[in-house]
Amino acid sequence: MHKLRTLSLPPYRGREFFLTVFVAPDPTTVASFSMPADADQWGLSVHFQPGDHFESHVEVARIDTSHGEPHFDRLYESPERKDWLGDDYTFEAARRDLLANWRTYAEQYFVNYTDDAP
């Protein structure tokens, strides 16, 4: 998939967080691209920049359609879990869920994977 746009989220635990929208086909190949109408596949990812800015971003949670139907990759859980959401699950529902709950998912990531848990 191809990155469509990235939204800066408020800082959390001293880190910069983002919500990125991914789509297929490549949105740069058309004059205008409208979500979700023009997307054959879509995905949203909550991620943060680690303390070392030379490191790649770290994904915390992702909802996408890359395996044929919408699913939630709960990357913050140990072990990571994939929840199938059903064919009627929409891009808008995914956007609302991640924007409403990203801090909860981030906190669980820190508890499970880092030394700076509360």
Please describe what each predicted stretch is.
Residues 38-82:
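A short, structured beta-strand/loop element
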Residues 64-118:
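Mixed-charge, Lys/Arg-enriched low-complexity segments
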